[in-house]
Amino acid sequence: MRLREAILANLPRLMHEAEHYGKINIQDGTKGGRSGASAPRWIEVDEHIHDALRYAEQVSPDGSRNLLASSESYFDFQQRIVRPARHILQMHSLKGFHELRAAYACERYEQITHHLAPINGGDCFQTDHHLDHKARVQISYELGHSRIDVVSAYIGGRA
């Protein structure tokens, strides 16, 4: 999920989907007008995602369906929570939240192909073009990108 998607996610709906379908549909806070039933983006839920959803529900303000308090703007949340958290990431040599998306993409590539992502020294593209392409299509979908070439920025190119 993008940071905005995570902040604005309808947590009760995601928990319901996770428990009943084993996957969640990313709809809120999406980029480029791709939201709701018109542009479904179903993501399989593993134990890590379940844990993250449970934690998000625990820290969600009373009366809120997402991470924002009812009187809080997205900008206020950015200033109060995101900026300090970004500073913590930087203290651990991470440039920001986008690097966490890249780590997720690399992990998914490895789960799908059973090879390291190209950026981590993997060579799946050289040994199995079809499997590499399948992984890129899936990861592109999960990240909410309409073009698979964008995935190369996260997992590395095909060289």
Regions found by a protein language model. Give the residues of each.
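Residues in the recognition helix of alpha-helical DNA-binding motifs
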Residues: A9, E142, A153-Y154
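Major-groove recognition helix of helix-turn-helix-like DNA-binding domains
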Residues: I148-R158
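C-terminal catalytic core of tyrosine-transesterase DNA break-rejoin enzymes
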Residues: R101-H145
